[in-house]
Structures are given as structure tokens and as C-alpha cells.
Amino acid sequence: MDNKSLKHSVIFRVEPDSIADEIGIRPGDILADIDGLPIRDVFDYRLRELAATLSVGILHPDGTSSEVLIEKDEDEELGIVFQDDLMDDCRSCSNKCVFCFVDQLPEGMRSTMYFKDDDLRMSYLNGNFVTLTNLKEEEFDRLLSYHLSPLNVSVHATEPELRVKMMNNQFAGHIMERLRKAVACGIDINAQLVLCPGLNDGPHLDKSIDDLSELGEHLVSVALVPVGLTRFRDARSLYPLRPFDQESAREVIAVAERYQKFFLKKFGRRIVFLADEFYIRAGMTIPRASHYEGFYQLENGVGLLACRRAELFHAISKRKRRKTHIAETREHISALTGTGEFRIAVISGVDAANYISESMMCIVDNYGINVEVVGVPNDFFGHSVTVTGLLTGQDILKAISGLAEMPNPVDVVFIPDVTLRSGEDVFLDDMTVRDMVSQSTLPIIVYETTGEGFISAIENMPNVFSQNSREER
């Protein structure tokens, strides 16, 4: 095994009292092989570690090596956690999609922002959506043999010529063959269609949904997502696309509702779902949480607002059953200003602001807090980008500065953590939360973007203000 391969097999943690712990494997060791064969990736490892008898080759940090014969119960795990979850390089995207958001990014951002992953294995590990265009048949068959489900697929169109055109990839036209093969292995499918007006909507959308319906019970969900366009697009001479307007958004909703009725009658499930942005663009009411049947594609903005609203009501209902919990929090918050009146601003994308404002009435009623939801225009990517998750630090800070200059400024600003890079305290434009706090004249609280996370942040406000007071002294 070469050094490039070995770097993916570094052991990060050994579970206490596990087999690996008992035989002396330690963090920093490298799993070189199992039964003399190198490890292809984490799926290869997971399958082979389940054998009742196996020999593992270990390379130690001091340059020595050892080989250990292990006899154990079949299906018992070794207890090794690797530094690299995938245990291999992540496959990059081989497409040049006409709607690709990464191609519309400005220059000068962090290099990781420009990496386009399209790795089926990441679909299983992290729920990523993949196009299945960069896999040889042998590798596709290997991954299907693990029978991992569901498979999240970026379909966009099922007509071969149209899919090839949209993805600029000659291998993109065989999507239905691959989906049928996956379904034959008992694997469920979540499909995503990024819709571009005049390109893959209208009769092409009907054709795509009709084709996908052939997958039967294994078709779990089909998400219809509007194309996202930034202000940098025109300067790049990219394929000419336009955003959805009210009329075209309503046309897509009508198609979706027609198929929902069809699937409800045939399978007892709606299957086809729309991103919240379609309802907002159309000026129509977003359905209730029960409409989404389990929220299969929240990461695509499908049912996100209904989900957060339901979570918020659930979090408050749970506290109401404790009787004193809300009253105590309300009393502590009232004491923060001395006047009994406390005001918070909640940062949001422009699209969601009105819907979030309606949900926040339960905060006013139960906690006595005045809530102002601030829809922040996206100057960084362009005003056609209206979702909260694509707000940058500089645009949020600009909005906070405006709030601070008001005659009666709010007491604290709440920022959802969906605006941060996953697992980091960094916004998309590389501004850190610490940078923002140091430049803001208003207190800032970053909260977990769930109903429970929001209520927990409210409950913790007295502690935050108390800590800030001590630091100022």
C-alpha cells in the first residue's frame, strides 16, 4: 500500500474495551491491510471487519509493524474510528452542469468552497446527492452490493439528451438504467430535480416524474428545487438561465399537486415535494408539517419552514407540561432590562422572513419577548439569492449595524447556525463569529437552527448576559 493510500487509514480513536483496544491498537496507528489485502474505502473495511476470523496488519508511528490474528463473534466490530471517515479521496464532480452554483461563486473564497464532490459513498455517509456519472459499472455494482439505502440522486431530467445537455457530460444519459439497477437490489431512492425555467420544467418535468414513478415503492421522494442564480453568473458567460417568477412557480406547483394526488391514490404517499422557495415565489401558503410525510429532503429546503415551525411549537408544548419552566424563563428575561420589555432580532433570508415572523408569535405569547425577524438582503451573492443558509457575515453585520442605529435598538441579535460552515464558527465569506461579535455594538447569540435550539438559546440568554457583564467588569 502506498503512502497516499495509507494516509486515509490513520486511526483517530479506539473505543474503550473494544477488540482493537484489547489487542493494543492505539490512536496514530495505521491499518495497513486486512488478510493481506489493502483497504479500498470505509465500506470495504466495514464489510471485512465483520468476519469471524481475520488478520490485521498495523503500522506504528515509530516505523515498526505488527500483524494480529483475531478470532471473534461474526458481525462484531473492531472498535476503530478513522481520521478520514471515507478512508479514501473524495471523488470530484465530472459534470459541468449549466446551473452549477459553484461555477457562480466569486473569486477569492476559501479553496474548499470550489470543490465539487460527487461521491456515491458520501451519499451513504452524509446524505449528499450524487449524479452517478463518474462511476464505472464495476464500482457501482460493488457499492450496490452493500445494499445501503436510501440512495440520494441528483436526477434533474430523465430524458437522455436533455440530461446530457444540462450536465455537459456524455455519460449522463443512462440515469434510469442505474436507478432501475439500484431498485432491483432493494435500494430506495430519493431524487432531486433542480428546475430551470424553459429547460427541464413543463413537459420535461412530467416526463421525468413519469419515468421515476416506474421505480414503484422504492421511490421514496422526488424534490423539485428552483435553480439558484448569483450576481456573478452573467460575467462568467454561463448558460443563460432565469429565475422562477410567480407565474412559472405556480405552474410547477400545479404539476406537483397533480402528481401528489396520483401518488396518494397509487401508493398512499405524495412522493413529490416542492422546495419552500416555490411557494414563497408563488405567493402561496406553505403546507403544514404533516404534508411532508417525514421530511425526506430538508437539506434541499423542502418543508424546512414547516418543520422548524412544528419543532418550535413542540419545544414550547414540552415546556408547558413542566408548568414552571416558561414562567421562570420569562421572569429571568424580564429582569434583564429592568423595564420588563425585552426585544430580540432574528436574522433570516429575505424569503423566509414573513413566515418566520408568523411562527414567532408563540414566543411573544409565552415569553413576553418582542421578536423582530430581519430579512437580510444578500449583497454578496446577489439579491436573487434569498435563502438564509447563503447569507454571509458581512451582509449580516451590515444588517446588525442598521439595527443598532435605530432609535429603539433591540437587546440582542439571534443568528441561525445554518449561516455557518458545517462544524465551524465561520461564515461563507470567511468572517468568524468572533470577528462579528468584536465589530457589533449589539450582543449576538448564534443558535442551533431547530425549534429546540431556538428555545434553548432564549432560556440561556440570562446566563449569556450575566457572563458578558462579568467580562466587561
Identify the meaning behind each predicted range.
Residues R46-F82:
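PDZ-domain C-terminal substructure recognizer with occasional recognition of PDZ-binding tails
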Residues T64, K72-H218, G228-R258:
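Conserved Radical SAM active-site core
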Residues A20-R40:
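Conserved PDZ fold ligand-binding element
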Residues M1-K4, V10, G283-R473:
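Radical SAM enzyme core and accessory elements
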Residues I189, L219-V220, V371, I444:
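Hydrophobic anchor at the start of a short beta-strand
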